């Protein structure tokens, strides 16, 4: 099994503010792929996944719109597929980043078992891709383009780090729960092709919301605190005084009983130079019984 550690780019003090904006913006797209929605069921045996979920989210930094994130998932029998697309333009267009994500696998009740994952991104003339293959125990293969040597200070990835983990798209299905408090009581092990990390969710509170049009769904958000815990593939120095507050990421979920799922309405990533926020513009759901549910904010 091939294991490749993450590449870390050193930056000068002059570059730091620009990198801070970019990292905060990119963190939104990453966070989005990790908690798009989760099944809300009484038991794993009762899990009934929707036929399709599609959503568009607006990405903002310090109150300025910097891009969007589109997500679609489809289910057929015990198989799933998910795709995502994001575009970010920051610093008055000086920085542009586009990314596409895809993943597929199987379902066992409300537990996803990933089979493959791919991410492609482009920033100016730099093109990157990540491809991950899975077997029954975890990561079976990793291919990176460009395939550059890892930074000598990066924490090496060990075989045990890659067992029973989710790729970012499979992690969208991994936050399953039996009750509202349990939706924010999870530790999600993730490997994105370069870094291995845990996402530790805990309940922060609840928040009332108002719909533009009546939906028949509960008008309340469940707010989860998300702590990003680096495991391997990272440079420890990057987490000594990071731009992003990795301990206080927030994901606000909304229960949709008619479809048996949770959907996130907001993701907030604090940073030292301002918050990056993702909020839902539209969410369209086709439930297992083909009921159509449209949410607008």
Predicted regions mapped to residue ranges:
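Bacterial N-terminal signal peptides
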Residues: 25-36
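A charged, solvent-exposed segment within the mature domains of Sec-exported extracytoplasmic proteins
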Residues: 137-203
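Acidic, serine/threonine-rich low-complexity disordered tracts
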Residues: 44-136, 179-297
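N-terminal secretory signal peptides that target proteins for export/translocation
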Residues: 1-20
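N-terminal signal peptide c-region/cleavage motif recognized by signal peptidases
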Residues: 38-42
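An N-terminal domain-start capping segment
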Residues: 21, 114-115, 168-172
């Amino acid at each position: 099994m091939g294991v490749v550690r993450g590449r870390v780019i050193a930056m000068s003090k002059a570059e730091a503010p620009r990198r801070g904006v970019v990292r905060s913006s990119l963190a939104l797209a990453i966070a989005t792929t990790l908690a798009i929605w989760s099944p809300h069921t009484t038991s794993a045996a009762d899990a009934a996944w929707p036929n399709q979920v599609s959503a568009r989210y607006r990405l903002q930094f310090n109150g300025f719109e910097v891009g969007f994130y589109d997500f679609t998932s489809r289910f057929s029998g015990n198989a799933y597929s998910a795709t995502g697309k994001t575009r970010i333009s920051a610093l008055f267009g000086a920085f542009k980043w586009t990314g596409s994500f895809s993943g597929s696998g199987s379902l066992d009740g409300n537990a996803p078992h990933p089979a493959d994952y791919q991410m492609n991104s482009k920033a100016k003339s730099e093109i990157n891709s990540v491809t991950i293959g899975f077997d029954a125990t975890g990561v079976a293969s990793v291919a990176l383009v460009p395939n550059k040597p890892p930074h000598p200070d990066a924490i090496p990835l060990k075989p045990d780090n890659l067992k029973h983990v989710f790729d970012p798209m499979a992690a969208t299905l991994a936050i399953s729960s039996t009750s509202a408090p349990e939706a924010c009581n999870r530790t999600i092990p993730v490997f994105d092709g370069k870094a291995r990390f845990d996402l530790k969710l805990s309940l922060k509170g609840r928040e009332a919301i108002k719909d533009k049009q009546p939906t028949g769904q509960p008008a309340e958000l469940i707010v989860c605190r998300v702590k990003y815990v680096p495991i391997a593939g990272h440079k420890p120095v990057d987490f000594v005084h990071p731009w992003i507050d990795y301990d206080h990421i927030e994901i606000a979920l909304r229960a949709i009983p008619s479809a048996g799922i949770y959907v996130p309405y907001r993701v907030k990533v604090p940073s030292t130079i301002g918050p990056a926020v993702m909020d839902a513009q539209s969410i369209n759901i086709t439930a297992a019984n083909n009921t159509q549910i449209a949410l607008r904010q």
